[in-house]
């Protein structure tokens, strides 16, 4: 039994160092303190609250049994019941109007977004077409330059080959020019 008593006794926990009480003076200091507390133990899971659902009024009752107004003849407590029903109905109508307005604004936003997207696509297509045109123009200019270079090389080759033979031919032409043109025997 002594062994069970010894095993049930836990070792004493180490004493935590006392922390100074810091009172935040503004929202930034409060946020800083919260972050410091979270970062002391990064392994601990952080509770992230869910997004609160939007408030919606209760649906109207299926059947209203006691239809009454604020007219004379109603009991002293009936006016308060009527007032609460009226307030609830006005809240429901305001909610429906707000939701309709929100849906209308969302639809307008989506239309505007679609128009902007189409305009951006058109502008991009226009610029793409312009870039392609410039690219083709540069490619065509490059081809023309290569063709001119080939033609100039070919013409220089043709000029070099006949130029050696042209000197001999030019000598014979000079002789022909010296001879009278009326002789046709050659």
Curated annotation (Swiss-Prot):
InterPro entries, A to Z: Prkrip1
Bias kind Basic residues: ranges: 126-143
Acidic residues composition bias: residue spans: 170-179
Annotated GO MF terms: double-stranded RNA binding; protein kinase binding; protein kinase inhibitor activity
Residues covered by region (Disordered): 39-61, 119-186
GO-annotated cellular components: nucleolus; spliceosomal complex
Major localisation: nucleus
Compositional bias segments (type: Polar residues): 153-162
Protein purpose: Required for pre-mRNA splicing as component of the spliceosome. Binds double-stranded RNA. Inhibits EIF2AK2 kinase activity.
Quaternary organization: Component of the pre-catalytic and post-catalytic spliceosome complexes. Interacts with EIF2AK2.
The family this protein is said to belong to: Belongs to the PRKRIP1 family.
Name of the protein in question: PRKR-interacting protein 1
């Amino acid at each position: 039994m002594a062994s069970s008593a010894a095993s049930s006794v836990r070792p004493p926990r180490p004493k935590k160092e006392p922390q100074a009480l810091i009172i935040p003076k503004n929202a930034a200091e409060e946020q800083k303190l919260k972050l410091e507390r979270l970062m002391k133990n990064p392994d601990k899971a952080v509770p992230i609250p869910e997004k609160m659902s939007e408030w919606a009024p209760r649906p109207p009752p299926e059947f209203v049994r006691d239809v009454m107004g604020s007219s004379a003849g109603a009991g002293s407590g009936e006016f308060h019941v009527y007032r609460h029903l009226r307030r609830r109905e006005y809240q429901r109508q305001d909610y429906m109007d707000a939701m309709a307005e929100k849906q209308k604004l969302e639809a307008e936003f989506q239309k505007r977004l679609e128009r902007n997207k189409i305009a951006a696509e058109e502008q991009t297509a226009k610029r793409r077409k312009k870039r392609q045109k410039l690219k083709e123009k540069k490619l065509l200019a490059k081809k023309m330059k290569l063709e001119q270079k080939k033609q100039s090389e070919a013409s220089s080759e043709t000029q070099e080959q006949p130029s050696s033979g042209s000197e001999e031919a030019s000598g014979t032409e000079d002789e022909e020019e010296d001879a009278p043109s009326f002789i046709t025997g050659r």
